[in-house]
C-alpha cells in the first residue's frame, strides 16, 4: 500500500471528487480530506506513480493540486547513530550508502556525526553489521543504535514540530513564545521591552524609560502624596542626563502633623538639592549648624597641643573650657588665710603649688598629750645621728626647743606621722 499526499485543495472539494480522480489510475483503498489537504492510499506503487505524474498541479475547483508521495515517517522506524563522518560527506551520499540495506526514512548530518532512520528493524541491524567500523570517504565509520531520546528541539532536518508552541513551519528560535511561555514583545509592547535604555520610538508603560530622557520609573504609579510631589515613584529622577541634579526626591508626606501645603514641599529635592543651581547639598533644607566633635577642635593651623589637652587640671576644669574662656588678668598673690583661698576660683589654683599647713588650733579635748619620742627629735646643729644605733641616748642630752612646747592635736599628729 502506497500513501499519496494531496495538497492545496479548495474548501469546496470533497473526498468523493478526489476518489473519482485517483480511481482512474488504480484501485483506491482509502481517501481522506483534512482541511485543505488530503491523503489517498493506493494498492500498487506503479499505479500511484502514474497518478502522481498525471494529477500533479491539476486544476480542481479553481486551485492547482499538489500531488506527491507522503513523506510521513513511520512510527516503527529505527534510529541509527553514525559517527566519525568526513566533513565533505553530504546527506545524499550517506543516505545512498544506507539504502543499500533497506529504505531510509530520514538522514540528518550534525557536524561529524549523523542520525539515520531506517524503516525496518531488520534492515537497521543489517546495516550496523555491514557498515560499522568500515571506511567511508577516507574515515572509519561507527554505526550503532542511537540511545538518544526523540528530538525535543529543532535544528536538524526540516522545520517541523516546534517544541515550544507545537506548531509547524518554524524553529524554536523563531517562535513568538519565549522561554516562559509568554509572547515576545515588539517595539511597541508593554513590559520590559527594548526601549528601556533608549529614548525615541514607541514607548511602553512599564519600567521603560529608565536611562532615557524621560521620567525614571515612568508615571505608571498613580499620583500620591506619600513620598513625592509628582507622580508616585517618578518625578524626573535618573533622567535628563543630569543624574541627581534635577531630581525632586522624597517630599514630605501628608499627615505627619503639618499642613497640606507643607506636605507638597520638596524637602530633599528640588533643583537646589543636588547642586543644579550651584548650591551644595546642605542648602537643600534648613538645618542646625554642624557641631564638630570635641576631639576635632583644632587651632587655626590644624595642630593640637596635646600637652595642654592632657595635662592635669583641678576637678571641674577641661581643656575645651580653658580654650573658649577669656583669659582673666593675673590675680594678686593670694594670702595664706584659708578664707581667701576658698573664694578663689578652682581653675586659678595651681595643683602643684605647696603651701605650709596652718598652725593647729588649741586642743579642746581632755585627752592626754603624750611626750614626743626622743628618737624622732634631733638637734638643729647636728649633721648626723646624735645617738648610737645600739641604744637610746639619754633624754637629758637632747635639749628641748621652744617649738615642741606648743600643744599639739593628737589627731593631726597621727595623720601626719602615719605611714
UniProtKB/Swiss-Prot annotation:
Cystine residue pairs: none
Gene Ontology MF terms: RNA binding; zinc ion binding
Localization, UniProt: Nucleus
Record InterPro entries: Euk_RNA-bind_prot (IPR050502), Nucleotide-bd_a/b_plait_sf (IPR012677), RBD_domain_sf (IPR035979), RBM4_RRM1 (IPR034897), RBM4_RRM2 (IPR034898), RRM_dom (IPR000504), Znf_CCHC (IPR001878)
Matching Gene3D superfamilies: 3.30.70.330, Zinc finger, CCHC-type
Residues of the RRM domain: 2-72, 78-148
CDD domains recorded: RRM1_RBM4, RRM2_RBM4
Modified residues (Phosphoserine): 393
CCHC-type zinc finger span: 160-177
Keywords assigned by UniProt, alphabetized: Metal-binding, Nucleus, Phosphoprotein, Repeat, RNA-binding, Zinc, Zinc-finger
GO cellular component, as recorded: nuclear speck
Region ranges (Disordered): 322-341, 349-371
Listed Pfam families: RRM_1 (PF00076), zf-CCHC (PF00098)
Major place of residence: nucleus
Descriptive protein name: RNA-binding protein 4.1
Species of origin: Danio rerio
Lineage: Eukaryota, Metazoa, Chordata, Craniata, Vertebrata
Gene designation per UniProt: rbm4.1
